[in-house]
Amino acid sequence: MPSTVEEESEMPAVQAIDIVVNAFTPREVQNGQTGFDVNFMRQVRMPEDMHGGVSIEDYLRRMDAAGVERSLLIAVRAGERNWKGSFEIPYDQIAAYCDQYPDRFSGLAGVDPTRGVEQLKDLDYAVNELGFVGAHFYPHWYRMPPDAPLCYPIYARCVELDIPIMMQVGQNLIYQKEVRLPSVAKPILLDQVAIDFPDLK
């Protein structure tokens, strides 16, 4: 609790939860785990001082300033492993951030429909062992619409694990100048998914 009236006035009245946050620390930048290039950073007007990454401590300061109580960090899986421009952030890497600040961060397990049973086991591990609270899917990175058959086992496992899955739908951006991804995740395609999985969150 704030100790003074001045401090209290600086705290937003309503605390929020940021449901999709990409880890963008110097570690992810140095390891090529961001998925975008300098052209994208300029396109979205990212301040120059952020191009090298933002420390976890700075994340927390920004969360406090914006009135964000908790953020959901994505252990991203973006594209098949052998595709140019693809990248991923290991589940354990995101779990370490969550363990460091358990009252501020929770993990989301990125999913790759092309990995089959391996992905289902990975999702079990993320939820049951690491304490992740949901799954996350980037359809455009796989050039795969959300109603594709390869996605269905993942949706079924999410229902079994009683976790939500979130995904990026709609118009896609140009993240990398040399890798153009199609806008395959049209929102209407979730209609059939919702019909087939009425209990999917």
Positions of the model-derived regions?
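Catalytic pocket-lining loop regions of alpha/beta-barrel enzymes
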Residues: 130-134, 144-201
